[in-house]
Amino acid sequence: MKQFKRFAWLFLLLIPLLIVAGCGKSSSSDKTVKIGIMGSDEKIWKPIKKKLAKQGINLKLVTFTDYNQPNAALTNHEIDLNAFQHTYFMNTWNKAHKTNIVSIGKTVRAPLRLYSKKVKSVADIKKGDQITIPNDSTNEGRALHLLQSAGLIKVNNKVKLPTPKNITQNKLNLKITAVDAAQTPRSLSDATAAIVNNEFAAEAKLPNKECIYKEKLNKASIPYINVIATNKADKNNKTYKKIVKAYQSEATKKLIKKYYHGLSVPAW
């Protein structure tokens, strides 16, 4: 009886140690990965987060409100991945900030669109009207090329990323104003038209009927395919590759179609 009691006490003393050991094993097997996204993309990523949890990957969604934050956070290792930018934006950022951010997987193609609450077609735009465009260098240049494609202006085609200073013809004397990309939907209350990136258009719930012109999906738009990005040192990370694979699924294609109604289309 005494021997049984001795073993019983020993077992009770070991229980806390066994619990701690068990918890340690569980936490080490779960991999936590932080990915930076724009707020409008949460509804796409939440089902992917659930799917990855079954594989032992804890995907944390970190939302941002403008284009300057996600790459800075990635470089500073505040997040591990981001999924908000196209290749051209990423390359321009790397050059300007001397960083080594690389793509590890394609997400969507998102044609840039010209919206208006005041006119129903490009032909209705009048002399002296105001048009707002994103002010980051990549999307500003892209927006000016879109206005040229719409027949509203001409730019110096020798310049890859034109600014308003590179406009060579503006017959309607349009007032082209560059604002923060996140503010372009709001500018529609004052401006005749605005070029709005798809995530901000989705967030503002801009109806398709207010789109009066959009970018063509062709070879010229390939650099504008959106990607999942990470720091170059982590490009071969196996867990990150599993996240890309989880995103690039038929289920995600259906979600993109459901929530974006053609604003974005799968690019893989």
Locate each region found by the language model.
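C-terminal motif of bacterial Sec signal peptides marking the signal peptidase cleavage site
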Residues: L18-G22
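Short, polar/charged alpha-helical segment
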Residues: M38-T63, Q69, A73
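Short helix-initiation/N-cap motifs at beta->coil->alpha
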Residues: L61-A72, V159-R186
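Beta->alpha turn/N-cap motifs
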Residues: D66-Y67, H77, L81-N91, D180-A181, ...
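Ligand-binding "clamshell"
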Residues: T92-I104, K118-K120, I195, E203-K216
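A conserved helix-loop-strand patch within extracytoplasmic ligand-binding domains
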Residues: I104-L152, K253
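Periplasmic-binding protein-like
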Residues: K106-Y115, E140-Q148, A202-T239, V244-K245, Y247-W268
